[in-house]
Amino acid sequence: MSIRVLIVEDQSMVLGALAALLEIERDFEVVGQARNGEEALALIAASKPDVVMTDIEMPAMTGLELAAEIQRRRLPVRVIIVTTFARAGYLRRALDAGVTGYLLKDSPSATLAGAVRRVHAGGRAIDPELAGEVWTEPDPLTDRERQVLRMAGDGASSADIAGRLKLSEGTVRNYLSEAMNKLGAANRTEAARIARMKGWL
């Protein structure tokens, strides 16, 4: 019986390449391709995949948000992240979201296929270089600080953030100030840059 795989990737060339690699394997069936997490959630219901293979950075809904939503809904699907981001912070957040596979896009195709089989069988498949780093530096940010800092890093003003999150501007400034202090940053832009570099946003 084939392992049913749904691929989620916003770059068409990478999406096609991953699908082609998996289709070569006799025991895999690519049952769907999505450009973001929102599309993927709709396809999960329709195509009933065993494994979702997703990128992290995508519009509409990131791979980490998709994994967290799959976990929240208790969908019977295993999630593998395939990304260019070799950051322990991302891996830690992925594990917290119930992800059981985390590989880098430059991994050999045999590693990718083996990871799908291992995860489908109930195991884990984590990039060995990242696995050793994952608990070395804990993420100091709260969920709300992360949310506010991500929006600020994307250029939103305190007023914009307050409006979108239904908070007061003073509360938004407090969250940003806390995040800056925790990261040792001089301003919100630097704080967002540091947090992104460490994989915390």
Residue map of PLM features:
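Active-site residues of response regulator receiver
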Residues: D55, T83
